[in-house]
Each structure stands twice: as C-alpha cells, then as structure tokens.
C-alpha cells in the first residue's frame, strides 16, 4: 500500500491505531535510525477543539495539515519539535502525532543526540523522539513522506504485534473543553515503557509485545 492510500481511505483515528507497532525510520545521511511506534494521537480537524486546524484555522505554520494525506507536518513549541503526518484528502486538515517509539535501529546515535540519555528517556515523548533523531528544525515540513528521509513501513508482516492497544485521552489537552479533552484518541501499546508517562509499576512483560 502506498502512503496516499494509507493516510486517506479510512477515519483518522483508525489510521492512528493502525500505526502502532509499525517501524518509523529516519535516514540521517549516515545511517538509518528509529524504532517501532508505540504511541500516537489522532487530531480530527476543523471540529476538534484541540487541533491546530480547529475552526478551519489556516496559516503558514499549520499548512502541512491541509496538504494531502501522507504529508509531513512538523511544528515547534519553544525549542522543541514534533512530527505529525497529515491524514485525509487535501484541505481536510486532520493528522496524527507520533508521540513515542521503542528504539531499535541506531540506538548509539540516538543516545548521543540526546546528550547521553538512554533507556526509556531516550524516546518516550514526541520532542524526545525528534531530539533522538537529531532534528532541530522544520526543514522536512510539507514534504511528502516518500520524498523525505522518513519512512513508515506499511508492510503488515513488518508490524510488531502488541498484546493490547489501549485507546485513552490525549496528553496535555486543555480541560476547559471536557468533550474533546476526554475523547480517547491516543493509542499506545499497553505496558510499553517507552509510552510517555508510563508508570514503572505498569510495565508489561516483553514491553507489551505479543
């Protein structure tokens, strides 16, 4: 399946859930680094009060969401960067935020990029993941995935099966809007230690993989 079909032919929350367990790989020009996606959040577009495109808001900063599904949308908050992929057809501004990966490839390089931080602290959050990749800018914003150094492996036999995928509330959502704050649009591998804010007491055997 190609990226255009994968990121357009079903609801964004279904796409987000299906991404869990798939390899996300970044080619930094010297080596390929990355891991299995263990946590991702869906943002449902113009009606989602937590989305950057809520109410049809459109600006150069969030233009990536308005591009065709499979387009990279990188945004910044202070000095931190976040990796999203647009979903649905052009001008239907929905997307998925990749929140965390379990690192597999290029771990030594990722530790160096994270100034020596290792273990679960390496990639257990969206900004940490981007730091681990060595990304400190928006150079790849608005690029289509297949025209970038990023790859999400869509081969089903390369997807790592989880024992359970949890649907839960998204992280850091403003509680002043209880409807959207409580929608279960975050998907993660149950008990995986690389999921953001996963408590050690909840760590699962084999990191939650089947």
Swiss-Prot record:
What keywords tag this UniProt record? Answer: DNA damage, DNA repair, Hydrolase
> For this protein, what is the EC number?
3.2.2.-
A biological process (GO) of this protein is: base-excision repair
Tagged with keyword DNA repair: yes
Which Pfam families does the UniProt entry name for this protein?
Pur_DNA_glyco
- Which domain of life, per UniProt? Bacteria
Disulfide-linked positions: none
- Which Gene3D superfamilies would you find in this protein's record? Methylpurine-DNA glycosylase (MPG)
SUPFAM superfamilies, alphabetized: FMT C-terminal domain-like
Any single GO molecular-function term of the entry would be: DNA binding
Q: Which residues cross the membrane?
A: none
Q: Which family does it belong to?
A: Belongs to the DNA glycosylase MPG family.
The protein here is known as: Putative 3-methyladenine DNA glycosylase
Origin species: Lactobacillus helveticus (strain DPC 4571)
């Amino acid at each position: 399946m190609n990226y255009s079909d994968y990121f357009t032919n079903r609801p964004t929350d279904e796409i987000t859930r299906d991404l869990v367990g798939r390899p996300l790989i970044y080619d930094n020009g010297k080596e390929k680094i990355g891991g299995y996606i263990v946590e991702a959040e869906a943002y449902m577009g113009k009606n989602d009060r937590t989305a950057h495109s809520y109410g049809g808001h459109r600006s150069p900063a969030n233009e990536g969401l308005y591009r065709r599904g499979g387009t990279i949308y990188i945004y910044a908050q202070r000095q931190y960067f976040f990796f999203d992929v647009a979903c649905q057809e052009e001008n239907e501004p929905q997307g998925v935020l990749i929140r965390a990966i379990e690192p597999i490839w290029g771990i030594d390089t990722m530790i160096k990029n994270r100034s020596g931080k290792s273990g679960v602290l390496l990639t257990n959050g969206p900004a940490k993941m981007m730091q681990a990749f060595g990304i400190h800018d928006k150079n790849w914003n608005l690029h289509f995935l297949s025209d970038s150094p990023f790859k999400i492996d869509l081969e089903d036999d390369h997807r790592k099966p989880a024992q359970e995928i949890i649907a839960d509330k998204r992280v850091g959502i403003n509680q002043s809007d209880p409807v959207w704050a409580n929608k279960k649009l975050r998907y993660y591998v149950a008990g995986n230690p690389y999921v953001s804010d996963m408590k050690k007491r909840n760590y699962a055997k084999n990191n939650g993989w089947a």
